[in-house]
Amino acid sequence: MKLTKGKINELLTQPGCEHNHNKEGQGKNKSCTQQAQPGSAQGGCAFDGASIALVPITDAAHLVHGSIACSGNSWNSRGSLSSGPMTYKMGFTTDLSENDVIFGGEKKLYQAIAQLVKRYHPAAVFVYSTCVTALIGDDLDAVCKAATKKYETPIIPVHAPGFVGSKNLGNRLGGEALLDHVVGTREPEFTTDFDINLIGEYNVAGEMWGVLPLFEKLGIRVLAKITGDARYEEVCYAHRAKLNLMICSKALINMATAMQERYGIPYIEESFYGIADMNRCLRNIAEYFGDAALKERVEQLIEEETTKLDLALAPYRERLKGKRVVLYTGGVKSWSVVSAAQDLGMEVVATSTKKSTEEDKAKIRELLGKDGIMLEKGSPTELLRVVEQTKADLLVAGGRNQYTALKARIPFLDINQERHHPYAGYVGMIEMARELDEAVHSPIWRLVRQPSPWDIWQQEHESLLNLEAE
């Protein structure tokens, strides 16, 4: 794939993304095709986006062709877990020096690939370009092609230098690498009538493991996971699925639309967070396949799981009812976590629209109602203002906002990719309720909100002086 201005515009203009236009491709929004403005890569560049989209392929090696900082500063930032191979946990880099920048890094890249393949025997090697190697003009395609032929191992170039744009664009560039070099290159041993792919699910904190057993009970086979806890081979035969389940549409919508065009695989956008959304997801899958027996199994499973959940969540609902929440996250979580909190009787008073599509925003408006606040930007000052204005009891956000909550002396729950607790599916709902309850009712908040001893002493001293003066 040649990374040209036209290709970037194509990735930024997706027919399935209602922020660009509706699903029929009408009403194109030209602003979506503009190149990245200075500063747009803050908080995650295109290289970072491509790597976090592809690194969860667990039996592949991931080689960063660039300076040591590109690999070191971003490695393992997303807590995607594996049920098998741990190759993806090892970071590989060509560690370019000044001499390599001057004379070119292609020879060093080839040597790095050779050493990696001989020593670790990965199922495949993904090679990531970075700002430096893109600027000096190293030919990744030629090196990867030669190495593939020599070592009979798929060596896949990923053209996502950081300067081309934001993390979201990098996600899509990672998806393009899969479409160009991986998907459709192998065939599964067999297929079933209910084969699906999960796209945009990264198994953060192992939360996908709470959802897969549900599909197994229903007789639905997850043919390929793109890319959480995935094996390289399963991504190769993902083109034989009957339905794509899009979990994070902002990130890999290009994969869903391209697979629909090339292989005729339709897609639906769903969420695994919250009882209502999980129920809706299972029902929509059954509705798509149109199988009466599957629909019956889905309804039976929903009844069983919701009955167990009602019992498990009863004490948490009683303790969390009426608590006010400010939610600051991005993408699908900006509305799906709202639904999960409302299932627990909590009131979400504000949420962010960072990285949200127009369809996401419509869902947020429906969930929050007319009084809900939608945050376009969430600087610490703005978040503190909203917390004070809404009298919020809790801030649910990413780890970088933890100190904002501490300043406001309110409880905080980490909801982003750095977290260590799974919140997806029915089991994840119980875990989320437990974490919310522990955060809100921790005794520390009663203590930190008390006046300091010296303030108490000062007040008592002033009161004593006033009495003496009288």
Swiss-Prot record:
Keyword Oxidoreductase recorded: no
InterPro entries, A to Z: Nase/OxRdtase_comp1 (IPR000510), Nase_comp1_CS (IPR000318), NifE (IPR005973), NifE-like (IPR049939)
Function recorded in the entry: This protein may play a role in the biosynthesis of the prosthetic group of nitrogenase (FeMo cofactor).
Organism: Rippkaea orientalis (strain PCC 8801 / RF-1)
Protein name as annotated: Nitrogenase iron-molybdenum cofactor biosynthesis protein NifE
NCBIfam families hit by this protein: nifE
Pfam families (UniProt xref): Oxidored_nitro (PF00148)
Compositional bias (Basic and acidic residues): 18-27
This protein's UniProt keywords: Nitrogen fixation
Positions of the UniProt region annotated as Disordered: 11-35
Membrane in keyword set: no
Matching CDD domains: Nitrogenase_NifE_I (cd01968)
Pathway assigned in UniProt: Cofactor biosynthesis; Fe-Mo cofactor biosynthesis
GO biological process: nitrogen fixation; protein-containing complex assembly
PROSITE patterns: NITROGENASE_1_1, NITROGENASE_1_2
GO molecular function: nitrogenase activity
Family: Belongs to the NifD/NifK/NifE/NifN family.
